[in-house]
Amino acid sequence: MRDLPGLPSRRSFLKASAATAAIAGIAGAAKAETKPEPAALTEYKPDCLQPTEWAFVMAAVARLIPSEGDGPGAIETRVPVFIDKQLAGDYGKASDWYMVGPYEPAASPLRGWQTPLNPLETYQQAIPVFNEWCKQTHGKIFAELDPETQDKALTSLQKDEMKIKPELREFFSILLANTKEGYFSDPMYGGNHGMAAWKYIGFPGARGSYKEWVGKHNVKYPLGPVSISGERG
């Protein structure tokens, strides 16, 4: 095809179009990767936890993974948000668990979940019981205690010194497990904000190629983590 004088050639037009599309794609990707900061925990509106339950979760995870360590704490990584969202979803309802009796609360933990209560119901029933025990033992509900007393109260819960009813005996275990999960999960689930926990331990996240590093030990990984959604830390 002959190019007309004074007009751009077909080849020049295609080159310019390709360059424009590439630039637009880069700009669009950069814009897509820029996400607004989520609401502060003090302003966050829980999906399922009631105010007293939310206050307990906030206080409890802050003691299980405290902020005063050499890495980020549970509050900085938004673990409470992860727990709230998990309890509001299939996990909280035990949607894909076998929940048909009989139940034997005194059975070994190796025999699995031995209560008719799902995780959300366990939180909902255990928190008021624990708060009442804290009031009777320490004078205030858990969230209002000082950090040292909170640690003592959580230790009592862990050791079953308060003799919580058998149906709720898994409460501390799932609270601790959910806290760990929220700390190390992919940010898409609400916790591990900014991949701070992954950065702290040097975990590469969901990188597409990691084979060349599988056999390398005691060598610091030089690149930051990548989330499932493609965010880079």
Q: For each predicted feature, which ranges?
A:
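Boundary at the C-terminal end of the N-terminal hydrophobic targeting segment
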Residues: A29-T34
